Amino acid sequence: MGQCRDLHHGLREWFRLASTISGLDMTYFYNELTYNGRELTQHGTQLLFYKELEDQLGDAFDSSRYALTEEKMCIYTVLTSRETLPSPEMVSRMVGWGRKHGIEAGGRVYANDMTSFFDEDGATFCLELYMPVRKIVSQI
């Protein structure tokens, strides 16, 4: 649906889109990062809409105006964090899990802050993390 420079810009774009066509509030935010084995670098926020929901939007939504992302095999996990973005250690554990299972992860990471809750210690964020697979090294 769109590429935004950061989550704040993504939220503004989401409100703009959701106010134009009923149902576009089902857009998801994915922070796009790269991982070089030590550090994470953020590259902005993508607004994604699941194509399976398109039929529910009616004729007001023209999907041909938006780029489609390709389906890719990914290493996937859900973790809790005190931050809205994953730490390098979280991503390193995903890479390690992949290696253990014969999967080589690419350097790209997509993070979605699915939900958050607050307690006496502050905010906790539930992060959904995807790392596209570069290649299958060996079958388990």
Specify the residue positions occupied by each region the protein language model found.
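A solvent-exposed interaction/effector surface
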Residues: 1-140
